[in-house]
Each structure stands twice: as structure tokens, then as C-alpha cells.
Amino acid sequence: MFERERTRHRFTARTATVSAVETVGAYVRVTLTGPDFADFASTGPTDHVRVFFPNPLTGELLAPVADEEEGVIRPDGPTFGRDFTPLNVRDTDGGRSFDLDVLRHPDPGPAAAWAEHAQVGDRLVVVGPRGSAGAPQDAERALLVVDGTSLPAASRFLDDLPESTSVDVLAFGDLTGDAAESYLASERAFAVFEAAGDLVTEARDLAPDAGTFVFAAGEASALTPLRRYLRRELGLSAAQVVMSGYWRRGVVAWDHHAPIDPYDPD
């Protein structure tokens, strides 16, 4: 149960050109395209690409370049790369395109600061994804626990989970239930709850069980007690609990591959 179809993609660096910029709620949506994306694929809701932005002081774009058919050559010197969920991969008159939703911040880093002033014709470099893992097709229920950084991934789960799976969304951190519901507007039915207090208490009230698939992502320290509750107290398997710390408060350029709980890693 909870098997996810896995697909490997050609891993390379691609030069991207901005073809559109718009505001979507709390996000700047940037549409990227370019000849390098003819074979670009992203078929899993937890996919991420590494996007390289210009140096905010000099404007220079230092980034990896493609190494022949596959792989990348990394440059000497500091780069400004951040991970994002690719959205709405599609073929257009201008070629294959996809969207990045960049969350606005009151104290923006390189990505958010760039997005505030992004213009059609601007260039970035995109690396990945290496592969995809699809949404499980046999879950009776899905619980998506998200803050503003992981809301785009939740939208992909809503698209990819079968209609037979009932879906609850639990918004935490600075993300309100109303904002989550507005962003996730979908043709399928789903319920949104807001974690006004302790995240474990809120999750306990939603009663995840043996038939529930859980995706939880966002601020890492907030997710640590939730992971202990799901994995240790409830005994849910690693296959049915997919959890990722997209960022950690007080840490710059946090590695989302790091374990949520370093004292109890999978």
C-alpha cells in the first residue's frame, strides 16, 4: 500500500527565460520556458528543481552548466540557488513551459527579492529534477500538512491523488486556512483546517489512521514533534508519511534533504 510510481529524468542544467509574471495570492508566479526544456518532465507532487538566481549585488548569474547529455558542471565561486516545486508543466506555442510560485517575504532572500522585480526576458538556470515519485493511488485518505512554502506541492497532490481519496489540508505557521483554500481552488472536494495551536494536537483531532497517507512539509522544527507522533506513537510506516523540512527558522539556505529529527532519522 502507498506505493508511488517512480520515474527517472535526464539530470541536466537548463537555461530558462521568463515568459510571464503575475501575482497569485501571496506568491509571485513566474513562468519559465526555453529551448532547453523540450524534454523537461516533472511527474511527481514532491518534485523539486534547483533554480539559480543572479547575484543580488552584482547581477551576475553564476550557475551550473550542462555536461554533455547528462549531468552538470558546477562553477567556481558562490551561487544563489534555491529549491522550488515546478508547477503546471505544459506545452505552449513558445515551447515547454512551467511555473514557479515564489512566496513573498518581508525580509526577502535572493529568490524572493529577484521575483519582486522579475520581468519577461529575464534569465535563470534550472537544474533537475532527477526523478519523480507519483502520488499513491490506493490511499483511502490523504492529510496534507503545509505552510506557505509547501502549499504549491499540496496543489500538485490535489491534482494527482485519485478522486476516491478523501483529502484534508492542515495549514500551519503563517498560512491561514482561508489563504490555503483560495490558493488550492480545485475541481475536486477537499477540506481545509487551520492549526491555531500545537500542530500535534491539531493533527490528532484529524485522526490519521492506517489508511491515511500523510504529506507534511514546511518549517522543520515545527514538524519534528509531528513526525514523532505519526511514526512513533501511531506507528505509521515510512511509506505513508512523507515529510520534508523546506526551511528551518534562523538557518540560511537550509538543506531540505536533512532529517526532520536528527535523533531519529529514517
Residue ranges and their predicted role:
Residues M1-D266:
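Extended, composition-driven regions rather than compact fold-specific motifs
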